[in-house]
């Protein structure tokens, strides 16, 4: 038994050593972005830009991967290296996560605007995009705001967010709304600080386990390690809304043509995630829904081979 374990360890070390080293760097994006509606401060931010950390590998058409809340771009490890055999693959830490800069409290930005500015910084006009949960919500906004920048979008574990449409609200009403939400979030931060990050993260890990599928054991260590590394900035600071929410509904319904969108639903994912993807699929004419059996919320981690195969088939078809 010891010999078997030793051989497996050697195989793991050799496999890791054989992985190509990706290029890494930072792209600066504006601290306050053009489509943001949630900022509460009118003064200039302390820093005019925020830096987004990214890794890049491979050649060909550009593929950009967007991660889930509470983790970082490492969640794409298996998918990243598989796709890099055929494409120029880029993964980055969204603002507020991983090695990227944290947001400035009170200043509004959209994750979708960050993605657009990030692509501009890398000289990418159009790309294939994939996002999981937080990343999927970002792509829902991006498809609504920047459809001309999308070759294909693969969205999994969440799409249109639940934030109300504030785009047509009078400025004074919008200010009252933002100030009220900001005050409520300050109160949430106070409660979080009293409970402590260890307790909150332990509960969060349990919540992620409850919506994972049959392969949870295979991702548990890596997933929990990323959650442990997470700064939890969103729990310790009053966060502005980084999504357009229901505004995406009206934008998508007005679009005469839509970029091709693939929705990958994990069999054991939450009902809310499934509903948000089904809702967006109904608005996008060029969309397709597929279910990944035995997978839960973290489809790309739980079933990376199937995720890549389905994504590549969809890209090839368009």
Show where each model-derived region lies.
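Catalytic active-site module of serine/aspartate enzymes centered on a nucleophile-bearing elbow/loop
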Residues: 286-318
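Conserved HGGG/HGGXW glycine-rich cap/lid loop of the alpha/beta-hydrolase fold
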Residues: 50-101
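Active-site loop/oxyanion-hole signature of alpha/beta-hydrolase fold enzymes
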Residues: 57, 91-130, 134, 309
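Conserved alpha/beta-hydrolase "acid-adjacent" motif
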Residues: 270-276
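Flexible "cap/lid" loop of the alpha/beta hydrolase fold
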Residues: 144, 152-189
């Amino acid at each position: 038994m010891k010999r078997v374990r030793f051989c497996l360890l050697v195989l793991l070390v050799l496999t890791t050593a054989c992985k190509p080293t990706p290029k890494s760097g930072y792209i600066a994006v504006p601290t306050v972005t053009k489509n943001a509606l949630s900022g509460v401060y009118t003064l200039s931010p302390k820093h005019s830009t925020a830096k987004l950390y990214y890794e890049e590998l491979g050649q060909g058409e550009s593929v950009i991967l967007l991660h889930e809340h509470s983790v970082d771009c490492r969640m794409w490890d298996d998918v990243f290296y598989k796709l890099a055999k055929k494409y120029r693959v880029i993964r980055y830490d969204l603002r507020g996560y991983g090695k990227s800069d944290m947001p400035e409290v009170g200043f509004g930005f959209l994750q979708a605007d960050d993605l657009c500015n990030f692509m501009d910084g890398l000289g990418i006009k159009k790309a294939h995009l994939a996002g999981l949960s937080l990343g999927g919500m970002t792509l829902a906004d991006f498809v609504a705001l920047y459809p001309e920048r999308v070759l294909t979008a693969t969205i999994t574990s969440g799409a249109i967010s639940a934030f109300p449409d504030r785009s047509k609200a009078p400025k004074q009403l919008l200010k009252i709304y933002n100030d009220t939400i900001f005050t409520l979030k300050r109160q949430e931060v106070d409660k979080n600080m009293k409970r402590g990050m260890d307790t909150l993260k332990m509960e969060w890990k349990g919540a992620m386990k409850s919506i994972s599928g049959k392969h949870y054991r295979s991702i548990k260590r890596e997933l929990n390690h990323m959650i442990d590394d997470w700064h939890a900035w969103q729990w310790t600071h009053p966060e502005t809304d980084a999504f357009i929410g229901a505004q995406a509904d009206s934008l998508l319904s007005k679009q005469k043509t839509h970029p091709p969108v693939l929705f990958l639903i994990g069999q054991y994912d939450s009902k809310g995630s499934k509903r948000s993807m089904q809702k967006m699929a109904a608005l996008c004419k060029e969309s397709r829904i597929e279910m990944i059996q035995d997978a839960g919320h973290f489809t790309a981690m739980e079933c990376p081979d199937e995720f890549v195969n389905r994504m590549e088939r969809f890209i090839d078809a368009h």
